[in-house]
């Protein structure tokens, strides 16, 4: 998601810097495909966003501990793999996951306004 946000910020900056683009159309339709959205959120970015939105550092530390050390196993040809560490993304199935994703996406929404 961080790459998507950075790309959109670059596009917006270019549109603002190019007067002919702004003159051609004062309205822009923005469509984003959040494919594998929860997996695409950089955890450090999420924690920084939470701190910027003035969530308590204690709450952010709690979320960090919840996400640190996350592992996943895969079923390949009927065999279960060894646990693999998951280093990015929001824990799927967590009741906070939709809210955390919305907060991370809010950075993009605020930059568009």
Swiss-Prot record:
One of the record's GO cellular component terms: host cell
Domain note: Has the canonical translocation RxLR motif, but lacks the canonical EER motif, which characterizes most oomycete effectors identified so far.
Main location: secreted
Organism listed in the record: Plasmopara viticola
Motif RxLR location, chain numbering: 61-64
Entry keyword Secreted: yes
Matches recorded under InterPro entries: RT_dom
Keyword annotations: Secreted, Signal, Virulence
Protein name: Secreted RxLR effector protein 78
Localization terms from the record: Secreted; Host cell
Signal sequence, renumbered to the chain: 1-17
Pfam families, sorted: RVT_1
PANTHER family found in the cross-reference section: REVERSE TRANSCRIPTASES
Gene this chain is encoded by: RXLR78
Family: Belongs to the RxLR effector family.
